[in-house]
Amino acid sequence: MESPSYKNLIKAEDAQKKAGKRLLSSEWYPGFHVTPLTGWMNDPNGLIFFKGEYHLFYQYYPFAPVWGPMHWGHAKSRDLVHWETLPVALAPGDSFDRDGCFSGCAVDNNGVLTLIYTGHIVLSNDSLDAIREVQCMATSIDGIHFQKEGIVLEKAPMPQVAHFRDPRVWKENNHWFMVVGYRTDDEKHQGIGHVALYRSENLKDWIFVKTLLGDNSQLPLGKRAFMWECPDFFSLGNRSVLMFSPQGLKASGYKNRNLFQNGYILGKWQAPQFTPETSFQELDYGHDFYAAQRFEAKDGRQILIAWFDMWENQKPSQRDGWAGCMTLPRKLDLIDNKIVMTPVREMEILRQSEKIESVVTLSDAEHPFTMDSPLQEIELIFDLEKSSAYQAGLALRCNGKGQETLLYIDRSQNRIILDRNRSGQNVKGIRSCPLPNTSKVRLHIFLDRSSIEIFVGDDQTQGLYSISSRIFPDKDSLKGRLFAIEGYAVFDSFKRWTLQDANLAAFSSDAC
């Protein structure tokens, strides 16, 4: 007898296949970011290099461009750039995941691709807390078709815990370890977030070890984050990293400007003890970056991908039948107790026509240019020592009628500013990152049809900060300009590349 989830899987796959090539007409459909063929996408899940290919799973609702009972979408790649959409991996409907296959991870268990995910059950529609969440397993030999194995971890660390989700598993000294987020409630707060640590010998029988870290007064988070979602725990350089997505932090100055955050704490790990040594630091300074997940590339690089969106932000692409995409894959490094992120070198595969201007000097002036395509990579070096302008930078995706996305250095604030108040349909707001204390600032920019990603560096280090935001300009907004306001600005180098549309391949996949 076919299980309810198998029937739902067939329906989901049928919805994905019916999408066909209709998204090619969407003016905002990305050219080089992983994006659903139809419906809704959020958290990346199960990133792994398995049998010679990179696999990316993701939270997916294929029936409409809104959040619904979560499935696991699936894509694979050989180069981290060209992704092939595969059949839907998981669908909800069984007793243990009736209302959603929530986020989780993937591990290679002796040649068996094994997914560990959260089964979500709604107990009542009267409250968001009337839920039950358990950790489940599914396995695959071919890496495409999965067999559910049911619940492997049922009990949360404490009684009466409803929110208990997003397992991340790794192997260390012949033991499997798992971190998973959970929430305890008290009378004064909406909730308090924690990360629990478990251990197993076989991936099926898990023992609670301890609460790895909780939202307490010893951390600058205080008791303000009511849930810690999507935890990850890994080594980078000579430090251990606890990465997670806290919900409920209040904005403070330039920090915590989004509804929810994504960041990390550095510390020392002597199993089973994690000793934090830094405060919580955000990974990205843009409007749209959440639920990041990390994995190890075939050459040992630590690579991160995040959901390139944010809860409650406007999603104009819903009119075209899709919502959500992933950030570019980013290489992680640890420099001076800070994680730095740079786009993976494989992105250079997409470079086509190149335009180079060696030195551009402006004095209260503009330097216009035209983009051949909305798919652009830009490298700009700004000489701070030789410049006096109050503001200097770029206007991108302009149409000559007021539509533009502004990226500029503001000397009065010592910040790099992204202003998307005129960036197209239903988006607004300003985000910023610190201006590096350096003589020259390097801006590495990727423009897709509905996004901008900026990597900020100094003389020595690329990727000190990143700013990732969605924009929704008109398709003919292809003008740009360099500018300097109230003084002169020296741009030592200005390089631009038109990029190939890597996502066209997704529409010719046999799986879709």
UniProtKB/Swiss-Prot annotation:
The active site is at D43. Keywords: Carbohydrate metabolism, Cytoplasm, Glycosidase, Hydrolase. GO terms for molecular function: beta-fructofuranosidase activity. GO terms for biological process: sucrose metabolic process. It catalyses: Hydrolysis of terminal non-reducing beta-D-fructofuranoside residues in beta-D-fructofuranosides. Belongs to the glycosyl hydrolase 32 family. It comes from the Bacteria. The gene is sacA. It comes from Zymomonas mobilis subsp. mobilis (strain ATCC 31821 / ZM4 / CP4). The keyword Cytoplasm applies. Transmembrane segments: none annotated. Pathway: Glycan biosynthesis; sucrose metabolism. SUPFAM superfamilies: Arabinanase/levansucrase/invertase, Concanavalin A-like lectins/glucanases. This is Sucrose-6-phosphate hydrolase. Its EC number is 3.2.1.26. PANTHER family: BETA-FRUCTOSIDASE. Substrate binds at W40, M41, N42, D43, Q59, W67, F102, S103, R165, D166, E229, W311. The keyword Transmembrane does not apply. It is found in: Cytoplasm. GO terms for cellular component: cytoplasm. It holds the Pfam family Glyco_hydro_32C.
